[in-house]
Amino acid sequence: MAFLQSAYLVMVFTVPIAGVILNTYVLRKLIRVARKSVVRFETTSGLPLAAMSVGDSITLCALLMQAIFHITPKGEVPTVVLSSICKFGIFLIHSTSAFSVWCWFFLSVLRYIAVFHPFKYRTIWRQPRNALKFLAGAVGMFQIYTLIFVTYRQEEKSCGEYDVFHESAFKHVHLLDIFLFYAIPSLLRITLDFLVLIHCYSPFSVEGLDRVTIDRRYAISGPATTKRFSHTGETDTLDNKAHVALAISITASTNTPSVKRIHHGNPKKKTAMVMRSILISVLNLLLNLPSHIFRAWASYDESSLENEIVRTLEPIAQMMYFSQFACNAFYLATSIYETNGSPRNTVISSSNRHVSRCISDDEA
């Protein structure tokens, strides 16, 4: 038990610092991408990855702030100041961690669209930015309840809730919080990632796969040289050194699709990339689960948490919760694959539509 407590205290201070360092590295890399092309940054996974990185950094800083707050002598500090620190810290932790969970779901949505609707994926424009704005606003509005519930409890010398809220029906808000910001996005992520997995992953060699499956694998990673079009006709060139010619032909009367594809890259590598992203996503869910179970348990029967076995397991659950941020940072640091794609010639076709993208490789 003492060992677990010591390990927990070490993680409280080391994980936030390490996580902020990793996220700073990720943000610097993404900023370089954004400077080269804002459109490329906003219409690929760059924007949600950056949003997740910022959210995780704020969460880690808030966790570190709370850890320092609890070991710092309070002296004659007014209770109203201590309560304000508690409110602000808990609000930041809840809001940014909930936002991060939905960002994971957002990445799963992008994977799903890339696999099952590759043409739509190539024509994404303002949707990611607008979705993240709405998500941030909705999460912030919901988590306002923490500013009302949380206070500094003199008896325990720690942050907690007012008794009037903890002992009333208001405690059900915690269950709603868990349901909206863990259960729902987690189930949706599992569903979408499972569909992508069964469509894109095969234990057999690439030669044995049908061409459509292989091409859908390629849709996961954005090219380094392409053009994206806005609804107003604006274009953005992602690589000024490459000569890009985009030819779009639409034949409404074609019943048999005409497909011509020349690929650059390794399909197995792209499949492994998808698998890695999904596995890290599942690991993140598992690391979150014990903490949410204890939180839901405490909402209904806090006295049972005094059991010796439960008191032993709770630090482990907390350590798993802190570990998720290292998991997030690892994902962010290793999965910015859309910023490093290689040029490719692609034709995307459906039953009555033929779209051709031709890329000159003179300087590739």
Curated annotation (Swiss-Prot):
One of its GO terms (biological process) is neuropeptide signaling pathway. GO terms for molecular function: G protein-coupled peptide receptor activity. It holds the Pfam family 7tm_1. Residues 1, 70-89, 152-177, 299-315 are extracellular. It comes from the Eukaryota. The keyword Metal-binding does not apply. The chain crosses the membrane at residues 2-22, 49-69, 90-110, 131-151, 178-198, 278-298, 316-336. Residues 23-48, 111-130, 199-277, 337-364 are cytoplasmic. It is a multi-pass membrane protein. Keywords: Cell membrane, G-protein coupled receptor, Membrane, Receptor, Transducer, Transmembrane, Transmembrane helix. Its main location: membrane. It is found in: Cell membrane. One of its GO terms (cellular component) is plasma membrane. PANTHER family: CARDIOACCELERATORY PEPTIDE RECEPTOR-RELATED, G-PROTEIN COUPLED RECEPTORS FAMILY 1 PROFILE DOMAIN-CONTAINING PROTEIN. Not known. Putative receptor. Belongs to the G-protein coupled receptor 1 family. This is Probable G-protein coupled receptor AH9.4. It comes from Caenorhabditis elegans.
